[in-house]
Amino acid sequence: MKEKISIFTLFIFCHLFYSQNTILWKITYPENDKTSYLVGTFHQYGESFVKKYPKIEEYLSKSDAAFFENLTIDTLATNKIINSRKTDNSITKYFTKSQIEKLENYTNKSGLNLYKLTPIELLFKLQQKYTRIICTTVEKNEKNGHFDGFLIKLSDKHNVRKIGFETLEKQLELLNKQYEYFTWKNQRKNILHYFENINSSKPNKNDKENLCGFAEIYKNFDLDYQFDKSSTLKISVTERNTNWINEVIPQLKQKNVFIAVGYMHLMYKDGLINQLRKNGFIVEPEKMN
């Protein structure tokens, strides 16, 4: 009896260990013969990363429909929404004239009006660029430098129907709602850190958020899904997960579906993996190669 228990325990341990070393998950439902897949993306990795793992495109190409966070991975579309707002000069109270000039020049080159960005939006954009350039998640001259955006293009290539969980406007709304406590005053140091390092000849890869560290962890699939913990991001993660699950479950029961969303949405007690399991689906880790 002890031997049986030991073997069973070893099996469970191996299964859990293995499940932490993939971003790709297989979804089946006992009451049908459909097979779907879920991939947890890291938005700032691009085409070259995806192409290292042919299974991703293979499973996407065989799907009846593909779900993404949104279908508008377009800088111009984002800029249009932000630039349509009223001007807010409150940033000038917390940055020097020289810093404002540099930030304004930077955002102008990106087609954005500095005085129409919120603190989290500017910080988020700087962190994205920092991750791509300083953490080198995207190769030089890479055409498709966005994981999800490249998968959307692959959906078109294989004539797979695309569905977006949210609009771009909704995503910006949720981002600002989650971080509404961010101000120019309390984010000044963070904004300057990323801005200065992006423009430095000797950038510091050790940032407060450990962006480069996590990029490396993700690349090596040395992941901890923390299924026994709850997410602290109630609006941008937990609430969105619940909304997405309600939308995708009927499709999973009828079709072969491919779901591509940020890796964090697969994590935690209230992540997509656990929620699918609670709804009777079998969700199993899939080897990357």
Q: What feature does the model see in each segment?
A:
Residues S84-Q99:
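A charged helix-plus-loop insertion that forms the helical arch/lid used to bind
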Residues Q44, I73-D74, K170, M264-L266:
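Short, solvent-exposed loop/turn segments at secondary-structure junctions
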Residues A65, L112, N159-V160, L276, ...:
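Short aromatic/hydrophobic-glycine micro-motifs
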Residues K234, E239-I249, Q254-N289:
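C-terminal soluble interaction/assembly domains
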Residues N21-K86:
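Start-of-domain marker
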Residues M1-W25:
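Bacterial Sec-dependent N-terminal signal peptides
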Residues T78, S98-K253, G271:
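Hydrophobic, often amphipathic alpha-helical segments used for membrane interaction and targeting
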